[in-house]
């Protein structure tokens, strides 16, 4: 029966949430810019929470400034905090870009962030003269509504609105919006672009900032920044690209802005599994007007061969529950169906029409009935799994206690993974990344269902 059973959370209380607040996504996007620094216009806890979350997943420090609003700012506003904070940040760190990220407190008090920034920029020009070259981008992320994915999308749209300029000359490049993914995933997508001989503009590139080599700074005078990141000039050039490929459904506002303002075509694909990666590669080849490389076809063949070797023997007929961000859940669900596994539950903490339609397509292609949990949380998933368990779960480390209590093995992926190390370096996108994911799933099944009975492994 090819249909989805949409299950929406009916209670107001969220228990063990699948999403976090908007500023998280905005800070993540800003840190993907070369010599870019976010400054949080809010309390100290707003930045500490995000730094902690990023650190325990990537095992890397995250440079995030904060205006440190206190009780008086809730009454009188945070004008002086923001102006002084931005000026100190520019003078001490000399960033190429500062992203000013709002929070609950600054949004509710109604601070005129853009007006405060104009004052700060005027004072910096007066004090520093030509040495002041930092670009300022205001990012509205009221954290009492929506979630981190919306904050990520708002940040990208703000970068495009503020920085992109139409110079009229086509640069023959393709904009890539990767979404909130791991460094290994971005490197794998860059590898695909290289095989296709296409130069991407990655909006934004967090691969090196969140997985940088530990080496001495090359100069003692310049503040230390991690290597890599998208240069500001590339964001300015994004308006002259030949197309935009988005791996994030919440990056669509940025790609839609590029389409409306600069007439740049856009497409959305999450390259996990065979069909999804095929769609991504076809779009890339069509937009860039290039042929698919033989090396990429070989990588596809290796994935197909791995599926033929493994799927029917160990995976066919099994059931799974997938939870996390909607792009990941939708991509993994389609890949599971290709492996002969039924994604019995697809659980996300948001409601998005692209996700709903995508899951309908997955169910139709596989002729399966999938329970799609919308605006949900891990507590709701736990209750469903108690009634109808699955063979394994796929998602981040936040589901580890459910997996332990119910005796269901957990295949870790997505964000955050904090009870294992190195996962952020291992891609799960593209053909090679899908082989990694296939191996991870299969080894989990072998350990749980075959290892206790060793004779089955000899069959």
UniProtKB/Swiss-Prot annotation:
Binds 1 [8Fe-7S] cluster per heterodimer. It comes from the Archaea. Tetramer of two alpha and two beta chains. Forms complex with the iron protein (nitrogenase component 2). GO terms for biological process: nitrogen fixation. One of its GO terms (molecular function) is iron-sulfur cluster binding. It comes from Methanothermobacter thermautotrophicus (strain ATCC 29096 / DSM 1053 / JCM 10044 / NBRC 100330 / Delta H) (Methanobacterium thermoautotrophicum). Pfam families: Oxidored_nitro. This is Nitrogenase molybdenum-iron protein beta chain.
